[in-house]
Amino acid sequence: SGKAGRKQINFTSNTGFTTPVRLPDMVNSVEFANYFNAATFNALGTRQYSEEKIALLQQYINDPTSVSIFPEVSNNTYGSWENSANGVANTNWFDLHYKPYAMRQNYNVNLSGGNEGTQFFVSGGLYDEGGSLRYADINYNRYNFNVSVNSQLTDFIKVKSNVKYTQNENKTPLAGYEDMFFHNLARMRPNVSPYDFYGNWNEQSMIPYLQSGSEGKTNNGTLVLLGGLEISPLKNWKVFADLNFRRSNYDGSTLKLPGTIYGID
């Protein structure tokens, strides 16, 4: 709570950045093809990537403009795009989807003051953190509010009260499919391009779903009320009575919309 005397106002703000840690260190498409060939040859006696395909992958790494990234594709049909040995690219799927950093901001303001009989303290805060995914509008916000008042009503009666409220809001376009998104992200082959025949994001990139307008929202609120009474009927004899009340509420909503995948029927 505040102290007797003149009012004081304090304001603080902090801005920082978050960055992903311990992301997988992905191999390039040539290394992947050689590893995959070794695995399939040991298991089945066959190789999925021919020497010609591996040479094309190396050529793409050396000069991406010197080779077609769709040598097996002749049209933009839906079935042309799959997570297979088809395609010539060098896609790091984690680099594609993760930004190098995301911004976070924290603001707090408080007011305190009072007199010999009553002291008060009021504070409020806002915390905002953006998500690390490049093509997904993910945000986390937290709001908090606090009021505390202590009052000496008489020489032997003192009351105190405190109200705290916190609201947490989380928004994501993954709309309940977070596990599937990250599961698929780690399984995509680097020789597969995120683009279709005409330069649009293909389904394997998962970006059409992130930009479809789908949205999952959750809100968590907590209200805490604290009250206390202190009575001193006799010298060196104090009686305390405290009341605590806590209430939490949660609500969530999910909107799932189809992604726009370009192609021909």
Language-model features: locations:
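A beta-strand signature from Gram-negative outer-membrane beta-barrel systems
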Residues: S1-N10, R104-N106, Q119
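Outer-membrane beta-barrel channels and translocator barrels
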Residues: R104, N115-E116, Q152-F156, S232-L234
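A generic beta-sheet turn/junction motif
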Residues: A4, G113-G117, L126
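Surface-exposed loop/interface segments of Gram-negative outer-membrane beta-barrel transport/assembly proteins
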Residues: A4-A89, Y127, G131-V224, F240-D242, ...
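Outer-membrane beta-barrel initiation region
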Residues: P100-Y101, L111-G114
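Periplasmic N-terminal accessory/gating domains of Gram-negative outer-membrane beta-barrel systems
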Residues: S1, G16-F17, D95-H97, A102
